[in-house]
Amino acid sequence: MAVKIKLARIGKIREPHYRIVVADARTRRNGRAIETIGQYHPMEEPSRIEVDSERAQYWLGVGAQPTEPVQNILEITGDWQKFKGLPGAEGTLKTAAPKPSKQELFEAALAAAGEEPVAEATTPKKKGGKKAEAEDKAEEQKSEEGQA
């Protein structure tokens, strides 16, 4: 039985995600797989590639043939060079910079707000409820009586 390491597409339209699977060469693209050994997300920047190196080495060792896209992915992760005994087994995989946590962002915003001068609101605050309206009317009547 010929075994291939290939990409099985998952994800939405225009948002592809792929599983790196080991399957019989005769099965469909998204057909039954023997084993899933990784993931590939090409739309992220940089592309996210996760490969179980130990399982990839096993399947390459027992004769599984990678398709061209999978071979390129294995070259990026360094698994292909390790299998062939070539230099450069560390790979050229780029990883995304870690995002700052929400707590760090909040603390930075507080520090920035503490340095800026505090300004009053540009619009006056509303007085709440009917009591405030009654007080306003009473003040207006007193001011009118005082003027008369």
UniProtKB/Swiss-Prot annotation:
Gene3D superfamilies for the chain: 3.30.1320.10
Domain of life: Bacteria
Homology family: Belongs to the bacterial ribosomal protein bS16 family.
GO terms for cellular component: cytoplasm; small ribosomal subunit
SUPFAM superfamilies per UniProt: Ribosomal protein S16 (SSF54565)
Keyword Protein transport: no
Keywords, in A-Z order: Ribonucleoprotein, Ribosomal protein
Taxonomic lineage of the native organism: Bacteria, Bacillati, Actinomycetota, Actinomycetes, Pseudonocardiales
Record-level GO BP terms: translation
Protein name: Small ribosomal subunit protein bS16
Pfam short name (any one): Ribosomal_S16
Region (Disordered): 111-148
GO molecular function, one term: structural constituent of ribosome
Biased composition (Basic and acidic residues): 130-148
InterPro entries referenced in this protein's UniProt entry, alphabetically: Ribosomal_bS16 (IPR000307), Ribosomal_bS16_CS (IPR020592), Ribosomal_bS16_dom_sf (IPR023803)
Amino acid composition bias (Low complexity), ranges on this chain: 111-122
Keyword Ribosomal protein set for record: yes
